């Protein structure tokens, strides 16, 4: 063990500590990462079929799905999916009323509580921007969908603006439309028209779009343009104008989630995800009307999408084939998911397209998607990595229990630090301790756990051997500041989980501890485990 650890005491001048104050910030209010499964399976099944498989979602890493609601058209007797609002007949409250109990039961499940109701897909046949009747019908349908979502306790709606019908591009200006400036005004009007109904019914709705403002604007590189209107004119692009209409209608209490679908091309995880998240709030505003910029900054959230096919394809010449990282394709996924989870505001979404992968093992009487594989079937270790990245602190005891059950749990720190430590010369009031794990490998996951009494502050950081730990690199959420109520002995438990970034040449993990000089202040029961290494899968 001597080559693994170095326990030393240092001057306060060289250490950084984080103390978490609980006053005014109850843990239940903390924003946690939410993973949404966006595969085509859920969009081609019904709300009832999702509910029939809810138990499988409860056991999964996911928190929700977009739910495709199927209703009966009373005029034709045929079933329609409500999200085709521009193609379909009007969806009324009466048509969707019997789906409210189904939706309510769906979101009562742990693995589905963050689900959305699918509310808009681009039309199969392009609708003229001047067609008042069709847009008014679509707006009424959106209102009915939002009212059902609100009544069922669903967080919000899913909005898909991707052009699935290349010859019918709704958000591209065409010959026969009014001149571009007039059509841009109409597009903004239609965006407001549709979403005014949504927010009137559900003022705090979360509107999730795989392609939000940022995605569209980075695709066409408008950020450097001194005249965004002119830039959109040159590209015949009406989407930013429609999105401004959504902002016109949105209350300040709403959330507009930019799914950043192009994030599946972010392979330099720390840099690209961080830059993209900043762009959602900062640079995306350059494509927003001045009167909406403050609202845009307040209601916009950065999210990131994962195209899982890229991690399991065997054809190395395929457009989306991601090479291994440190010899592991799971390691590549872990690195990307870590970046997305660190820098998303709230949501990360995952999907598959061509590899016959679904979020769970479906069991449907119809047989649809039965027998398809899950990501963990195709990329062993996927589930473990997903649980670790979504909520490292919750994952820690689960992973420790798994390792113990398999006989593979080893406490790398075999003896106590000491129940009571005395103050050092450097500070008569506090004692500062540092523990370094010196032979860690890039991509590995480690977990610390100890008990503390009295005034104890602590933090885990990664760094490079011989260098100070990077100020950028606080790689645990939350810190390991002791939390929870004291036990019978007056001790509280502290847990910290750290993942070593893949670009470190000589990584070390540093646990920094500060103890009050009071005789009863101290730490004991110290545990350190190597939790996961993607290279072992």
Indicate where each model-derived feature is located.
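Short carbohydrate-recognition loop motifs
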Residues: 414-435
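Exposed low-complexity, polar/acidic, P/S/T/G-rich flexible segments that act as propeptides
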Residues: 520-537
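Positively charged n-region of N-terminal signal peptides that target proteins for export
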Residues: 1-4
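Extra-cytoplasmic beta-strand recognition segments
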Residues: 431-462, 494-498, 502, 526-527
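Extracellular carbohydrate recognition and processing domains
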Residues: 470-506
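Bacterial N-terminal signal peptides
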Residues: 8-19
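Glycan-processing catalytic domains of CAZymes
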Residues: 25-412
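Short beta-strand-plus-loop segments that form exposed binding edges in beta-rich domains
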Residues: 511-519
């Amino acid at each position: 063990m001597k080559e693994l650890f170095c326990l030393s005491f240092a001057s306060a001048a060289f250490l950084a500590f984080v103390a978490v104050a609980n006053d005014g910030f109850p843990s239940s209010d903390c924003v946690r990462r939410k993973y949404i499964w966006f595969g085509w399976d859920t969009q081609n099944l019904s709300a009832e079929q999702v509910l029939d498989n809810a138990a499988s979602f409860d056991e999964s890493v996911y928190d929700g799905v977009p739910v495709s609601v199927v209703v009966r058209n009373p005029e034709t007797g045929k079933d329609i999916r409500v999200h085709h609002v521009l193609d379909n007949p009007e969806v009324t409250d009466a048509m969707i009323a019997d789906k409210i109990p189904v939706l309510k039961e769906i979101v009562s499940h742990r693995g589905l509580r963050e689900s959305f109701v699918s509310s808009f897909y681009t039309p199969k046949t392009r609708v003229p921007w001047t067609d008042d009747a069709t847009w008014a019908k679509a707006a009424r349908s959106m209102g009915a969908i939002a009212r059902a979502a609100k009544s069922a306790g669903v967080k919000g709606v899913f909005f898909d603006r991707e052009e699935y019908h290349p010859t019918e591009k709704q958000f591209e200006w065409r010959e026969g439309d009014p001149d571009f400036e007039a059509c841009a005004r109409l597009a903004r009007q239609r965006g407001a028209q549709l979403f005014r109904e949504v927010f009137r019914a559900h003022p705090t709705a979360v509107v999730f779009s795989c392609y939000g403002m940022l995605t569209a604007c980075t695709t066409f590189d408008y950020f450097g343009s001194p005249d965004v209107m002119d830039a959109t004119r040159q590209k015949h692009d009406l989407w930013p104008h429609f999105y401004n209409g959504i902002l016109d209608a949105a209350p300040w209490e709403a959330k507009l989630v930019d799914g950043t679908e192009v994030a599946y091309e972010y392979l330099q995880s720390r840099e690209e995800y961080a830059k993209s998240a900043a762009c959602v709030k900062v640079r995306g505003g350059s494509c927003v009307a001045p009167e909406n910029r403050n609202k845009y900054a307040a209601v916009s959230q950065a999210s990131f999408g994962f195209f899982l096919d890229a991690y399991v394809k065997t054809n190395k010449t395929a457009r989306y084939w991601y090479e291994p990282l440190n010899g592991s394709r799971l390691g590549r996924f872990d690195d990307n998911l870590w970046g997305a989870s660190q820098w998303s505001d709230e949501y990360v979404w995952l999907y598959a397209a061509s590899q016959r992968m679904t979020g769970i093992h479906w069991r449907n009487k119809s047989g649809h998607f039965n027998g398809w594989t899950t990501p963990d079937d195709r990329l062993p270790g996927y589930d473990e990595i997903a649980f670790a990245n979504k909520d490292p602190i919750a994952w820690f005891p689960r992973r420790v229990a798994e390792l113990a059950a398999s006989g593979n749990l080893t406490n790398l720190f075999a003896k106590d630090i000491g129940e009571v430590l005395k103050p050092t010369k450097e500070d008569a009031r506090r004692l500062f301790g540092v523990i370094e794990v010196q032979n860690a490998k890039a991509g590995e996951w480690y977990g610390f756990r100890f008990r503390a009494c009295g005034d104890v502050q602590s933090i885990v950081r990664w760094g490079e051997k011989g260098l100070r730990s990077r100020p950028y690199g606080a790689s645990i959420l939350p810190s390991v500041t002791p939390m929870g109520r004291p036990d019978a002995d007056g001790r509280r438990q502290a847990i910290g989980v750290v993942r070593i970034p893949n670009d470190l040449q000589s990584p070390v993990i540093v646990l920094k501890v500060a103890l009050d000089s009071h005789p009863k202040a101290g730490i004991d029961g110290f545990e350190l485990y190597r939790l996961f290494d993607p290279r072992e899968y």
